[in-house]
Amino acid sequence: MTSRTAPASPVVHVIGAGLAGSEAAWQIARAGVRVVLHEMRPVRTTEAHKTDGLAELVCSNSFRSDDAANNAVGLLHAEMRRLGSLIMQAADANQVPAGGALAVDRDGFSAAVTKALAEHPLIEICREEIDGLPPQEWTNVVIATGPLTSAPLADAIRGLTDESALAFFDAIAPIVHRDSIDMSVAWFQSRYDKVGPGGTGADYLNCPMTREQYDAFVDALIEGEKVDFKDWEKDTPYFDGCLPIEVMAERGRETLRHGPMKPVGLTNPHNPTVKPYAIVQLRQDNKLGTLYNMVGFQTKLKHGAQLRVFRTIPGLENAEFARLGGLHRNTFLNSPKLLDESLRLRASPRLRFAGQMTGCEGYVESASIGLFAGLAAAADLVGQSLAPPPPTTALGALLGHITGGHIETIDAGPRSFQPMNINFGLFPPLANPPTKGPDGKRLRGPEKSVAKKQALSARALADIDAWIAAHLKLPKAA
């Protein structure tokens, strides 16, 4: 459908059907409000998308840790499940083994989201590009066009805000066909044999390197041909959570050994008495287990260089690649200046923003901001206002970062605002942090840190449940 004629009953328009837009549309419809979801693909595609499916995962297939007690992103998972998140439902239904992480079959995940939205009676999906500001008669709009917002819409937003959109680069990791990996060299094992959702403790493929192999690999990364930047891209920074592997290598020869190639928690069964100097890990990318992505191997190497360099990795000498790595430019808003606490544009409150373009980083973070934007948009339509969750929750802490928290002033220069993953550093401190363990002994070192995270998580889950009960009347998750 491509009609822009608004339905007779009140409606919210959501522009962009990625993770944030799909979640926003779902939450609006769950609240009993009609929604028109606009998606430009396949009418107009992007340099990173490969399909016309909704909520397509263009980078990793991992939603990261699912540990709600000890990890901030796992906590955000738990809060979103309590809030009836479609993205989390689809992720849980399409998970693949990934140690302690929640990873998904990307095609199955996108298909599940697409099906749920297409079948909802209050959701109309329009395949069209919104090539400027939404029409004035659209009085309640969620813009969730993501980091790959089309140029005409980005220019229109920039003109409305009189604010230059910020930008950074994201890099994409290669995907390898499982049957092309040499299993006389590689082996299955999760780090420290950790068992995660849908996993067995042997969920990653590991390729070992000697010191000599590692040194040669680092040299090849640094010397390999890279994609050239256009003049207007040269000052665009990388997001540190998605640095190309060759950029990490340039920062120091040992950087990779302390990052994605760290050799800890793993034992090579082919040579158990010799500790590898470095290890390359691959993670299952689809439910069939036929594809594996190279963990942490985002890259801007040219395709020929990728084939040459990555086939020097032991076990990948004959690797066949389903997808090579790539690089794309992301844009995001100066949200603390431009958006209010409900994610509305101060210059035009009928427009609300959601997802990665607000300055969050990560699949789950983007979807969670879409979730709140959808709830807030639905409340607006019936003349109500929805206060954000308390900052003690993962969702509230992330919203606080986006709409005003954690802004630094550097000397006399402008305030800086950068994309952020959810982390416990965004949470307010505990009033009474734990000092003693269950045995009564004083907590020290790592034990103290673990206890603090668990206390922050327990407080967050209690507070999100209280917020749901007070504002949303949703049933608690089991």
From Swiss-Prot:
This is Methylenetetrahydrofolate--tRNA-(uracil-5-)-methyltransferase TrmFO. Belongs to the MnmG family. TrmFO subfamily. Catalyzes the folate-dependent formation of 5-methyl-uridine at position 54 (M-5-U54) in all tRNAs. Gene3D superfamilies: FAD/NAD(P)-binding domain. It comes from the Bacteria. The keyword Cytoplasm applies. GO terms for biological process: tRNA methylation; tRNA wobble uridine modification. Residues 438-448 have a biased composition (Basic and acidic residues). Its cofactor is FAD. Its EC number is 2.1.1.74. It is found in: Cytoplasm. GO terms for molecular function: flavin adenine dinucleotide binding; tRNA (uracil(54)-C5)-methyltransferase activity, 5,10-methylenetetrahydrofolate-dependent. It catalyses: uridine(54) in tRNA + (6R)-5,10-methylene-5,6,7,8-tetrahydrofolate + NADH + H(+) = 5-methyluridine(54) in tRNA + (6S)-5,6,7,8-tetrahydrofolate + NAD(+); uridine(54) in tRNA + (6R)-5,10-methylene-5,6,7,8-tetrahydrofolate + NADPH + H(+) = 5-methyluridine(54) in tRNA + (6S)-5,6,7,8-tetrahydrofolate + NADP(+). Keywords: Cytoplasm, FAD, Flavoprotein, Methyltransferase, NAD, NADP, Transferase, tRNA processing. FAD binds at residues 16-21. Residues 429-448 are annotated as: Disordered. The keyword Phosphoprotein does not apply. Pfam families: GIDA. GO terms for cellular component: cytosol. The gene is trmFO. It is an enzyme of class 2 (transferase).
